[in-house]
Amino acid sequence: QEDQAGNRYLYLNEGQGIHSQWNPTQIAFRRTWDFFLSAPYFNATPHTADQVDSLLIIGLAAGTIARQYSAVYPTIPMDGIEIDGGIVEAGARYFDMNADVMPTLTVYVEDGRYMLNQINKQYSVIAIDAYRPPYIPWHLTTVEFFSEVRTHLSDDGVVAINVGRTPSDRRLVDALTATMLEVFPTVHAMDVPESFNTILVATVQPTIADNLIRNRDGLAANAQTNPILRDT
């Protein structure tokens, strides 16, 4: 779907949620995907942009997260896993998910957990955007799954997950937080304004929420910081 402003949206599951957004002149949208850019900066200060050196996306959809990371970190290798080949085709056709715009992105059409077990790499960031209510892939919510994620993270790695909720029902957010805390020392929660989404960020190292504020201040003060990252 495309609106009058030139925004294209990918709707799935009876149109209950927007899973990708694209605009020819805009990268960041102040929506859920932008919060994934903040995830590495929960690490201890100073954590700088050059310390983010790789990304894995489980639930690639049509590539909004990949496009943002490619714009901010143009040289880092990115792997994206998407179970639906039709969505990948739509991403290439309508959302610029191609080698010209994202030259470092490798796409795998496969189940996220299966493909994770086939990849022998570690990443700075693993982004999971595969929970698409009302269809939650429960095999991506277990202690065993998050243990597998942990083995694929670098020493200062983070995993960020988009979780759906309602204003009065945070049971899934709370349950996932408890599960992740069985594997990771710290889990942070960021509620996305004007949405029914919470981004959970788990860190390999013990961390505090104030790290994000301090790192953002450092990025803002650095003239070399990409404006997309500075404004996120």
Report residues per predicted region.
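Soluble small-group transferase modules, centered on the S-adenosyl donor enzyme superfamily
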Residues: 1-32, 38-46, 186-232
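The AdoMet/dcAdoMet-binding core of the Class I SAM-like
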Residues: 4, 27-160, 168-177, 181-183, ...
